[in-house]
Every structure is written in C-alpha cells, then in structure tokens.
Amino acid sequence: MKQPSKLIAGLVAVCAAVWIIAAIHPLDRQAWVLENILLVVFAGGLALTYRRLQFSNTSSVSLAAFVILHTIGAHYTYEKMPLGIWARDFFHLSRNHYDRFAHGAFGFLLVFPIRELLLRFSGIRRGAWSFALPVAIVLAVSGCFEIIESIVAEIVAPGKGVQWLGGQGDEWDAQNDMVSALVGSLLMMGVVAMLKCTEARPHLHPLPLSPAGRDARASGSEGRGVGLGEASAERNKFPHSNARDIGKHFLPIAVACYVAFWIALAIHPLDRSDWLLENLLIFISVIVLAFSYRKFRFSNLSYALIVVFLAFHTIGAHYTYAKVPAGFWMQDWLHLNRNHYDRVIHFSFGFLLLYPMRELLVRSVHAGKQWGTWLAVAALAALSSFFEIIEAVVAQIVRPDLGAAYLGTQGDIWDAQKDMGAAFAGAVTSALAIVLLKRASAEAVG
C-alpha cells in the first residue's frame, strides 16, 4: 500500500490541529455543528477516496487551505468573524464580507482539483471545455449549497429566513455568494490558462490518465464527428434520434411551428417590458443554436426537447410567470399558496435539456457517456444558478426600488433556492431515466 507523502501527512495534521482548536468554545455551538456537517462529509469523502484519487500537491494544498478557512469561519460564525469586521470598518463597507471571501475562496481553491479530476477520469481533453466545466461544477455546487442552507434554515429556525443564515439584511445574499464563487473559480482558471499549466508546468498534473479516464475517453470518442456528414452518422448512435426515422424535414417544421407560436404570443402580452426581458433568453438561445448549427448539429430528439422548453417559456413570458392561467389552475386544484408555473418551467429546464446537454458533452467534448450524463446535470445546475444571478442583476438595474418583488417571487424569500432546486431535480430525474433506460436496453439485448 502506498503511504501518504510527507506533504499530505503534514497538511492533514495542520487541518486537524486547526479544527480541534476551533472546536473549543465556538461563538455559537449550534451554528458550529451545522457548519461542520458538510466539512466532515467532505473530509470523510477525501479520506475514503485518497488511494484512488491521489491529488497532486497543488490540489492538496488548495483543499487544505479551503478547509482551514471554513474551519475559522465556523468557529466565529461568518457574520461575526473578526477579520471581516476589521475589513468592514477599515474599508467602510456595509456588512461583514468574510462570507463572500469564503465563497470566493471556495471557487478559487477548489476549481483546480476539480479540473484535475475531470482531466484524469472523465475523458475530456485539455482545452476550453476543460476550463469551462470545472467552473460550471463550482457554480453548481455553490447553488446546491444555497439550497441546502435554505432547507436547514427552515428546519432549525423557521420564519427567520436569511437573518438566521447571516444574510445581514441582504436580500440578494444567495446570488452574491454564488457570484463570489463564480468569480473565484474564473480567476483561478484564468491564472491556469495564462501559465499554460498543462504544457509549461506538467508537475501540476503528475499522474497519467487513469484507466477509468481512458475508458471514458474511449466511450466518448465515438462522438468526435461534429461536421454535418459526421454528425449524421453519429446521431444514429443515440436512441430515437435518427433523422430518417423522424423525417429529414423535422427541424425546419419544428422551427416554423415554434416561430408561428411565438408570433401569436408576442401580440398583446400582459406586460410588454417584462415580455422583452423574458425573451432575452429566447433570443440568445436561438442565436447560439443558429450560429453553432454547422459546427455541431444536435439530434432531432434534442431539437424537439429544446423547442418544447422554449414553447413553455414563451407562454410564461406572454402572461408573466406569476400570472399564467395554468399556474392559477394548479394553485386552485392542488390548494397551493402561490402560482407555481415558474417552478414547473425550472423543473422542465433541467428535465428537458438534460439530454441535449449530455449529447453535446459526449459528442463534442468527448466525455464518457456516464460522465457526460452527470456532467450535464452539473452544467444545467450551473446555468440555473447563473440565471438567478442574472435575474438579480436585472432586477437591481430595472427596478431597484422593488428588489426581489420585481421578479414575481410572490412573497417567497427562498424563491431563488426553490427555482434552482426545481431545475436540479428535473436534471437528476432525466439523468436517472436515461441510466435506467440504457440499463433496461442492455439487459434486453443481453
């Protein structure tokens, strides 16, 4: 059995010592326990997977640094961390920003180990996607952490909401935390890109591609063709996606139907300004799909799923999400406390777009099919988190006087967390469906 290096042993000893000292008389024992639950799970996971993962020295130092920062924050509670209070007074800030610093450190310090794991195990290759996917995973995890925080807050201190979490009066606390993690991860990936770590500093990735990574790359390399001719052959490898079965004119017909539907709902929307803002997503999506069509063509099934989601979103934009008739019908029939059409759309975002995202990652990024499925979940969770950030920015620009109320939260202080949770649940449901269908198909063939 390979023994841990002196560096690893030293890092473990330092982290353990800091944790033990911080565990003595924390400022708030209940908050300390809650803050340390995820830390203990995280440390346990690293310990159990050490022999398999064996991070590089750079990644190990990054992980240890984050553990120490979080341990100190948990001891004082993030809201009352002395260093943050000093910075608040010295720079004349509106609040203690140690929590923002910790979220930024989360992105900055953990994105490198995540990238290392992806390069070694997932089959993806060095390049733009090897930088984008780790950032997406960081943002997805940050969003999931905000979801978990909201659940814990409602269980431990129902009714106190973000005040119990140390939001310090910031109604955009969750979005600002996610921005901090995103900026931190982008900074680290920018540093890695500038230093060209993959070529100029090979010692940062001392281990060769793992057997699992070679298998993943082999399974993902089936989808290398991205040109029109190669894409046609590749689409045959995805179930129910052969254009000849559905009709070679499927895409033009689907586009024509959607355009007609969009034009009909563009006439006299309930709120024209809200309609314009909601349609920015549609405009951006259509432009991206149009310009990338010749380089990467999705299967007909993927295009169908994309069109269905855009149609659902178009309905929400016409009525504004808080006033969609179907949502009122669900509210009355199921005796709900609000119009939940927005939750349906967020769930649909994850459920319907999981397959297209998986197809993109497997065929274009060369991720293994299993890795592609779960990386697609992370990518969609990241997009959902990013959308909540964009919404917050737009609300503060367009109607700063209304704040979160402008977004149609309908009085729900956890609206952002529930939207992200719905998208994540939809993506996981779709991923499980794909895994089960593939397993059933394999058993039937066998």
Where does each model-flagged region fall?
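Hydrophobic alpha-helical membrane-insertion segments
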Residues: 61-70, 133-147, 304-313, 376-390
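Membrane-interface capping segments at transmembrane-helix boundaries
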Residues: 193-204, 435-445
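Interfacial helix-loop-helix junctions of multi-pass membrane proteins
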Residues: 28-32, 80-84, 98, 142-143, ...
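Intrinsic disorder/low-complexity segments
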Residues: 202-244
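Internal alpha-helical transmembrane segments of multi-pass membrane proteins
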Residues: 122-139, 365-381
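Membrane-interfacial alpha-helical segments at the cytosolic side of multi-pass membrane proteins
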Residues: 41-50, 105-121, 155-157, 179-195, ...
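"…centered on the first transmembrane helix and the immediately adjacent amphipathic helix/loop
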Residues: 16-31, 38-42, 46-108, 112, ...
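N-terminal membrane topogenic signal
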Residues: 1-12, 240-255
